[in-house]
Amino acid sequence: IVVIDADFSGRGYDLRTTEKNIQLYNQLSGRAGRFSSESLIVYQTLSPEDITLNELIKNNPDEILKKELISRKENSLPPFCRLIAIIISANNQSLSIEGARQIKTRLSKIIGLEIMGPVDSPLLKIKKKFRSRLLIRFNEKSLKQKMVSNLLNSLKISSKIKLTVDVDPVNFS
């Protein structure tokens, strides 16, 4: 079995890239072993030094998951925190950014939130709409999430702006 372009980095801004790559490896190795006792999986990559890829080649997925959890804890990522992504869409980029700034100003009144952004979304324009993002990080689950929800529901924003809220986002695109 040959895996083309097996670069396991976080392309696509997906928090679960490592987990998905382990699942893919398990699926491929299971299929390869169906037909004969000896099988070979070949990875083509631009990053042969990639830690995830090398641990998979050594058939050591548990080590990958341990390292992933340590990294997530050190960087305050789920499951060690909660995240809420807010995507602000508008017909022009300046309106999108300005809407995001106003929302950030309002959210900053809630103590205990770390608000990152606004930044351009990695997928800046979809269906002729410019997108900006805010990412909110916090520790307590229900109280802060409820406060953010209440604040967003009470916002009086321009009808030219659309908000999309993603609680515990899987990716950041």
Residue ranges and their predicted role:
Residues 15-22:
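Short, conserved loop/turn and helix-capping segments at secondary-structure boundaries
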Residues 1-15, 27-173:
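Accessory helical-bundle/CTD segments and flexible terminal tails appended to RecA-like ATPase motors
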